[in-house]
Amino acid sequence: MNAKILALLIGVVFVGLFTVSTPAHPLCLLDPPFGFCQSSISRFAPVVGKCREYIYGGCSGKANNFQAQAKCQANCG
């Protein structure tokens, strides 16, 4: 019985070593687009692996300028 558990554990570790993680979408690696205009719009952007709220100035935006946290998380995690 212990040999089966050990074999299972070794198998799990072996699979874990060779699992390839998918790289983040390039969109998710961009800095938050603050914008240069005078607006003060609440938006979400991926920062250090989390979708965080920031204030967007209203122009010169990028594709990672999400209106909702759920949409940011759906695209970037």
Swiss-Prot record:
Principal localisation: secreted
Miscellaneous note of the record: Negative results: does not show inhibition on elastase and chymotrypsin.
Tissue expression pattern: Expressed by the venom gland.
Domain of life according to the entry: Eukaryota
Family as reported in the entry's similarity comment: Belongs to the venom Kunitz-type family.
Keywords, sorted A to Z: Blood coagulation cascade inhibiting toxin, Disulfide bond, Hemostasis impairing toxin, Protease inhibitor, Secreted, Serine protease inhibitor, Signal, Toxin
CDD domains: Kunitz-type (cd00109)
InterPro entries: Kunitz_BPTI, Kunitz_BPTI_sf, TFPI/VKTCI-like
Gene3D superfamilies on file: Pancreatic trypsin inhibitor Kunitz domain
A molecular-function term among this protein's GO annotations: serine-type endopeptidase inhibitor activity
Protein's cellular compartments: Secreted
GO cellular component terms listed in the entry, alphabetical order: extracellular space
First and last residue of the signal peptide: 1-24
UniProt function note: Serine protease inhibitor that inhibits trypsin (Ki=550 nM) and thrombin (Ki=26000 nM). Exerts anticoagulant activity probably by the way of inhibiting thrombin.
Protein name per Swiss-Prot or TrEMBL: Kunitz-type serine protease inhibitor bicolin
Site (Reactive bond homolog): S40, I41
PANTHER family membership: BPTI_KUNITZ INHIBITOR DOMAIN-CONTAINING PROTEIN, KUNITZ-TYPE PROTEASE INHIBITOR-RELATED
A Pfam family recorded for this sequence: Kunitz_BPTI
Disulphide bonds in the chain: C28-C76, C37-C59, C51-C72
Domain BPTI/Kunitz inhibitor per the UniProt entry, residue ranges: 28-76
